[in-house]
Amino acid sequence: MATTPMTVVDHEAEEAVAKAREDDKSRQVDAFDAGKPPPFRIGDVRAAVPEHCWHKSPWRSLWYVVRDVAAVVALGTAAAAMDSWAVWPVYWAVQGTMFWAFFVLGHDCGHGSFSDSRTLNSVVGHLLHSFILIPYHGWRISHRTHHQNHGHVDRDESWHPITEGRYRRLPPRAKKIRFTAPYPLLLFPLYLFYRGPDKPGTHFLPSSELFSPKEKGDVMLSTTCWCIMLASLLAMSCAFGPLQVLKMYGLPYLVFVMWLDLVTYLHHHGHHERLPWYRGEEWSYLRGGLTTVDRDYGWINKIHHDIGTHVIHHLFPQIPHYHLVEATKAAKPVLGRYYREPQKSGPLPLPLLGVFLRSIRVNHFVSDHGDVVYYQTDHHLNDTTKQK
């Protein structure tokens, strides 16, 4: 069939219309404001989650504990037997990741998603978290505050933004520590002892502002367990030498801390995601929860118990980790544009390191005023860092 001038014109017109539609669609995507109130309620999201996703199986939860404990014991036994400097770095990375898996299971105990038994949750939570030097109840309570106030500029507990006025008053060294790698990945132990800017207190003392008088006994119990673990490490250092304890425990612990800080940061920041933070009447539990971001960690997803499915976890922390993926899939049609599809990482989550590095270069502070605010960038800080 011959091509006529009219056919060419019609084809070009169709292409122009298609391009216009794509451009219009792109503008609509860019125009989406995640800070606007969503057209759905939290009850709508909950109704979309299958009923069985709320079921907690203590036996299934305990199976994950047994699996992870067996892995930690096997890794430690193998590394000690080989005692080779060619093996130690691999051991530190893998064992540190397993310590991180311990943390996630203990975290589930704190939420009550491990089982319906408070006693079982407390026993398992203390065993897992004390092993990695975390005061179980102290951290559980502060983490509860984080969930109850997620996305609130002033009341959130974990990686909350600094206001511009507070940021300007920070000494240069404090800014560098907070916004220059690798320092942000090493802050968790300091947070346990000192919390953060404008939030005094400690996770170890019942007199801390974090706790109510009725929580005093819980805090003291967890601090006692923490002290027992620390004393055990000191005793092993005397028996086997500090270098051996450093190789077997200290450096995996450091890897665990980096995992915890990295994952926590990534779930509440992004270098290209425009994530709102709220104050006053603009904040609600639903809107705050929707500021969180899901992340894909490749095959590590299953090792650290699908912690990357963070949006649904923040909205409904009672859902067990082994149901989070299914619950997320069920809720996505309701969440719509308010759900940010995570970028696929491949076998290892190496792209997320780039996301983290770019994010700490642009997410510095939020305005002192306004009930819906977004991160702003201190370009002078970046210029100073380059010069150094």
Swiss-Prot record:
Protein name, per record: Probable fatty acid desaturase DES1
Region entry Disordered, spans: 1-33
Record organism: Sorghum bicolor (Sorghum)
Annotated motif Histidine box-3, positions: 310-314
Gene: DES1
Chief location: membrane
Tissue spec: Highly expressed in root hair cells. Barely detected in panicle, shoot apex, stems and leaves.
InterPro entries: FA_desaturase_dom (IPR005804), FAS_N (IPR021863), Fatty_acid_desaturase (IPR012171)
Intervals of motif Histidine box-2: 143-147
Entry's Gene Ontology molecular function annotations: oxidoreductase activity, acting on paired donors, with oxidation of a pair of donors resulting in the reduction of molecular oxygen to two molecules of water
Keyword Nucleotide-binding: no
